[in-house]
């Protein structure tokens, strides 16, 4: 009986040691999630509440003392500086176009690009939005896309704002770099400052006197839209090239009264037939790499 007991105990100890060792094997160890709540947030991931320089606390005179009169003054000015309604910014990329010739004047939409713009216009009409402002890049392909969309939505063409800040370009050197697209540093400097100026012009929380939610439609370009998305969400702007959006797709961003930004659609083109889904220049007519 003693031998049997010793055998059982020895076998049990051996099995326990074996399984303990197996549990220590790196292949079977489960690490804590990198999103563990005890881990401090990296400084770069913190939200900048004054990203548009319109945070109310940054606009009013600071408290000079703790007297009731001064606190009342401060609170009244703070309330007066606060936005009350949200701003919705809907970005549409132009339709497919022909990259023929060196001048923008020859870069017209293809027949497929015109159909894409028509479907997008119908989709925007179905959403039932009452537009407060429509802005279009001054490049031909964006102008043609805008004209087609305007036939579908309730907005007067004469009120469209044509903005050169929205023209296509190289916003910032992408990370990771890509071998097939390497603009000169001077182009990033020239285009980047212009595109950033476009972002600051159109992306900000509502003015305090805005009494209802507003809707702005911007017809522009792939690089510009992707950069705007990264900047608005406070993602590293260098990551813009990792995003892909289709021709005539819809991207919808909302800026709340607090200044927080959320994205509703990113490159939405699911309302189009599959044969109209494109995101690059047609290869058979492309004259540049």
From Swiss-Prot:
A Gene Ontology cellular component where this protein is annotated is: mitochondrion
**SUPFAM superfamilies listed in its UniProt record:** Phosphoglycerate mutase-like
Q: Gene3D superfamilies under this entry?
A: Phosphoglycerate mutase-like
User: Keywords for this entry?
Assistant: Hydrolase, Membrane, Mitochondrion, Mitochondrion outer membrane, Transmembrane, Transmembrane helix
A matching Pfam family: His_Phos_1
Q: Which reaction does it catalyse?
A: O-phospho-L-seryl-[protein] + H2O = L-seryl-[protein] + phosphate; O-phospho-L-threonyl-[protein] + H2O = L-threonyl-[protein] + phosphate
Transmembrane spans: 7-23
**Top-rank taxon, per record:** Eukaryota
Q: Name one GO biological process term.
A: positive regulation of mitochondrial fission
The entry's family comment says: Belongs to the phosphoglycerate mutase family. BPG-dependent PGAM subfamily.
Could you describe the subunit structure of this protein? Interacts with Pk92B/ASK1.
State the function annotated in the UniProt record: Displays phosphatase activity for serine/threonine residues, and dephosphorylates and activates Pk92B kinase. Has apparently no phosphoglycerate mutase activity.
Q: What is this protein called?
A: Serine/threonine-protein phosphatase Pgam5, mitochondrial
Tell me what organism the protein belongs to: Drosophila melanogaster (Fruit fly)
